[in-house]
UniProtKB/Swiss-Prot annotation:
Lineage, highest ranks first: Bacteria, Bacillati, Bacillota, Bacilli, Bacillales
Physiological role: Probably required for nitrate uptake under anoxic conditions. Also possibly involved in excretion of nitrite produced by the dissimilatory reduction of nitrate.
Organism of provenance: Staphylococcus aureus (strain bovine RF122 / ET3-1)
Ranges that cross the membrane: 14-34, 45-65, 69-89, 97-117, 139-159, 161-181, 211-231, 246-266, 268-288, 294-314, 331-351, 353-373
Domain of life: Bacteria
GO biological process, one term: nitrate assimilation
Primary residence: membrane
This protein's name: Probable nitrate transporter NarT
GO function term, MF aspect, one: nitrate transmembrane transporter activity
PANTHER family found in the cross-reference section: HIGH-AFFINITY NITRATE TRANSPORTER 2.3
Amino acid sequence: MYKTKGGFQLTLQTLSLVVGFMAWSIIAPLMPFIKQDVNVTEGQISIILAIPVILGSVLRVPFGYLTNIVGAKWVFFTSFIVLLFPIFFLSQAQTPGMLMASGFFLGVGGAIFSVGVTSVPKYFPKEKVGLANGIYGMGNIGTAVSSFLAPPIAGIIGWQTTVRSYLIIIALFALIMFIFGDTQERKIKVPLMAQMKTLSKNYKLYYLSYWYFITFGAFVAFGIFLPNYLVNHFGIDKVDAGIRSGVFIALATFLRPIGGILGDKFNAVKVLMIDFVVMIIGAIILGISDHIALFTVGCLTISICAGIGNGLIFKLVPSYFSNEAGSANGIVSMMGGLGGFFPPLVITYVANLTGSSHLAFIFLAVFGCIALFTMRHLYQKEYGSLKNG
């Protein structure tokens, strides 16, 4: 795989996704440091942490479409140039408003996810798409890189200088993509409105979007709220909290290709149903945990299932929507991103209302149960009885 042109582009785009996600997620692991210099309330913190998800989700639809029109090279390159501005602005932030504004435009780093999942399948045969997209999805590890490295570096050189150091990395990858990006990538120029009309009539798009809303939403949400949550609720050291959050993110990321492989080898919908059953159990564990050990078990369970689930879903998307892949990838990945926006806000609201966050995790279990019913419906329409496939 890696000796081919596709293998090279897969590697390049995966590394580009790493950098994009590093930028997208930079605020969360540094928030314990930022709030020492910027006067912010817990309510404002939850909003600041969630805001990058908005643009990072909404832009996934046009980014996926544009990738089919102009190619991944130019969408990645332009995104990196744009990211330089909010990164610098964040390093100068002195008010909650400045943090929110910079965080909003950092969403560009999250939006580039739909670029690769649209471009990468063009280089591989159908039976390898699940694995290829799973490998590309490992670029999510950029979130873990920020969680692992940003806090200890900030402890040495300060959070502002840590943020500015990202400017070098992003500028470097803009140059690399400009030089090595594929200008010969196959273009698919189906009119956007025609694609949307076709997609809007296909119930599978709604189901896949909802499932990804849960799996990728959990991945994003836990990465956002865990550092601050662990410090505030369990009294964990800031650096240790960043490392624990990084473990959650890394585990989910490395298991994503496993989900793709399972989807290539077995019936992806049936495997996804098993995955969601285990995720529901993990959510229930979180809903009853008051001790850090039990909370850790619940988090790791969610991490495993979110990672495998993400890989399985993006095995299904290109197989169901080959002619509208760019727009379908954009819509599904947008819903996944939005799935990461609401949980931190809900957790904060529930904690303020009840004095505990337990009920918020039970909501995740309920959402998972609803997803199981939709999976059963799709499976029976596509394959008949669950005993088949």
